């Protein structure tokens, strides 16, 4: 169905091809996962299938790509539209109508399908993707995850023979992601649809793939094979695979179910390490009650997930200024969670000195948007040096809460104070030194034509020393040239640049909306390392995320939202271990022991 024959793509002005010598075939009715680190050319390969490369992007395509026998060099994207449906990383760029129902129907209208067929398929898609309650909603009022589901639905309704999906679950909550992937799998198995998908969150998708096509590095040869074979040599892998490597399991498990079947001996070994109060105690332990504290600083050599230095603990961080006093591990035996992780976050709130005032306080916050009550009676206090993950379903109110903290959203009721001021009443030039937001769409912050110009503008706006932003870019995004245009960066690279722009002003409160969207595991590990350093300096970090692995690695505290209300607020381990939707893979595999990360397990087994 899809055939690549010695394909190389070189963009205008580039010295080297973005991808080189791609040669493989995707048969009809097969789901192939395209994997690899950020920036290796996955989106370029996908674009070559739809004809966007080179007809829209420019550049030179050498070799040949055929889809259902049509050569994409001689067929423009509109001539492939009846065969190929494409969902890119940015759902907004796909929308051409104003409401959900109209968007689902638009592709079928363009193909001239009869009205009765269109009506039936729209209803089917609304039900399949859980969009029925949103059918009349304006697209601009939807959350990022809801927009992503609409974008996927809009390419499903014309029933294309080939689906090209670029990060299709990046903005979806875990439950919604499973629903969408189940629909895609059903199309493959029942209708023979051919799917080529790129996705960084391999823990969500690897079990659905018939084969994996791995781009291990820029310009490197493509590696194609069965999922377990490719994962054995891949530089990027999900936690279940990394845990399998650590435990020496062969073949490597790809699902939580497979891993649990083999995990009993590992659980028994780990149970021996629980008596001292927390997982990961021992080498590198700082003695302050943090799991595996110090392991990340020692450089354990983790290739993907980073080190669980602070996972599941309270807001106290060694060296933070100001910060709650150091914690001592609990010595009770009242259950695994308390023994292993303690109740540090709750204690820290009462033990903090009086002068350590909250960085931000939200009291009785309510936000109404038309008929939708986005937030209801939300109370939240954020302490210096604390890392908080806001989690919940798409549309739960996470982005609205972040918008309230940064002054983009005016409360309908209640109060919001950040650094002693009311955000929506504070001039932007003053507020930028108190709070910074990296939005879901990083392009909203990027206006210059080069990385260097973007960094120079950020330094001027923040009144920071020249080179401040560029140094941050070097840490978060190594290897990117000053003359690179932000639009030529991958989604993950643009996010890293936007984060550097925000951090140039050194705000004490840093807000990030879906910060790992588009990031591979190595880039996520670099982000975690940098955010930990900010927390050690006393900055408060608030993440709105669907990435349960990020929350397990980084967050001291998790706040769960549902229908605009806070339904849970506590230490990471206490909240996520008991949640079937928001528990990380390691927790599910090793339950009832509440380990959160591979790094904690590795540290315990030393």
Question: Residue ranges of each PLM-predicted region?
Answer:
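Catalytic Walker B motif of ABC-type/P-loop ATPase nucleotide-binding domains
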Residues: 163-166, 510-513
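Conserved ABC transporter NBD signature motif
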Residues: 58-70, 414-422, 431
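Helix-to-loop junction immediately C-terminal to a conserved catalytic motif
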Residues: 50, 406
């Amino acid at each position: 169905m899809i055939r690549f024959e010695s394909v190389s793509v070189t963009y205008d002005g580039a010295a080297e091809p973005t991808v080189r010598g791609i040669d493989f075939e995707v048969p009809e009715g097969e789901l192939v996962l395209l994997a690899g680190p950020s920036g290796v050319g996955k989106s370029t390969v996908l674009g070559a299938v739809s004809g966007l490369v080179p007809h829209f992007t420019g550049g030179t395509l050498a070799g040949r790509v055929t889809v259902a026998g049509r050569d994409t060099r001689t067929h423009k994207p509109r001539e492939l539209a009846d065969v190929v449906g494409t969902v890119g990383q940015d759902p907004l760029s796909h929308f051409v109508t104003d409401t959900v129902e109209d968007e689902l129907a638009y592709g079928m209208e363009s193909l001239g399908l009869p009205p009765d067929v269109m009506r039936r398929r729209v209803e089917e898609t609304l039900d399949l993707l859980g969009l029925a309650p949103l059918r009349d909603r304006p697209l601009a009022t939807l959350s990022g995850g809801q927009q992503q589901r609409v974008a996927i639905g809009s390419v499903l309704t014309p029933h294309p023979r080939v689906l090209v999906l670029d990060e299709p679950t990046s903005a979806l909550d875990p439950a919604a992601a499973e629903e969408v992937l189940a629909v895609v799998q059903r199309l493959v198995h029942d209708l023979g649809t051919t799917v080529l998908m790129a996705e960084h969150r391999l823990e969500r998708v690897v079990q659905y793939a018939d084969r994996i096509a791995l781009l291990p590095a820029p310009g490197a040869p493509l590696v194609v094979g069965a999922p377990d074979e490719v994962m054995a040599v891949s530089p990027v892998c999900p936690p279940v695979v990394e845990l399998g490597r650590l435990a020496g399991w062969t073949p490597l498990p790809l699902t939580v179910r497979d891993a649990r079947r083999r995990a009993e001996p590992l659980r028994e070994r780990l149970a021996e390490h629980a008596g001292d109060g927390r997982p990961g105690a021992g080498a590198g332990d700082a003695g302050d009650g943090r799991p595996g504290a110090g392991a990340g600083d020692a450089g354990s050599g983790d290739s993907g997930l980073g080190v669980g230095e602070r996972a599941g603990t309270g807001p106290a961080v060694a060296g933070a200024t100001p910060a709650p006093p150091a914690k001592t591990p609990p010595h009770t035996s009242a259950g695994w969670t308390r023994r292993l992780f303690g109740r540090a976050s709750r204690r820290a709130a009462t033990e903090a000195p009086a002068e350590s005032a909250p960085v931000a306080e939200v009291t009785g916050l309510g936000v109404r948007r038309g008929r939708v009550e986005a937030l209801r009676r939300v109370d939240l206090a954020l302490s210096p040096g604390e890392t908080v993950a806001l989690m919940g379903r798409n549309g739960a109110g996470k982005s609205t809460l972040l918008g309230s903290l940064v002054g983009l959203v005016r409360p309908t009721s209640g109060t919001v104070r950040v650094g002693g001021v009311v955000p929506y009443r504070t001039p932007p030039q003053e507020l930028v030194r108190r709070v910074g937001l990296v939005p879901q769409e990083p392009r909203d912050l990027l206006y210059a034509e080069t990385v260097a110009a973007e960094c120079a503008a950020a330094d001027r706006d923040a009144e920071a020393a020249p080179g401040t932003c560029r140094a941050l870019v070097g840490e978060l995004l190594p290897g990117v040239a000053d003359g690179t245009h932000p639009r030529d960066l991958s989604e993950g690279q643009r996010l890293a640049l936007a984060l550097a722009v925000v951090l140039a002003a050194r705000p004490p409160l840093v807000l990030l909306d879906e910060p790992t969207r588009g990031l591979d595991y190595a880039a996520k590990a670099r982000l975690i390392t940098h955010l930990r350093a900010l927390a050690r300096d006393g900055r408060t970090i608030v993440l709105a995320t669907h990435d349960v692995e990020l929350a397990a690695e980084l967050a001291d505290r998790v706040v769960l939202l549902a229908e605009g209300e806070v339904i849970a607020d506590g230490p990471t381990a206490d909240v996520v271990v008991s949640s079937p939707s928001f528990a990380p893979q390691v927790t599910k595999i090793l339950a009832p022991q509440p380990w959160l990360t591979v790094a904690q397990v590795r540290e315990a087994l030393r």
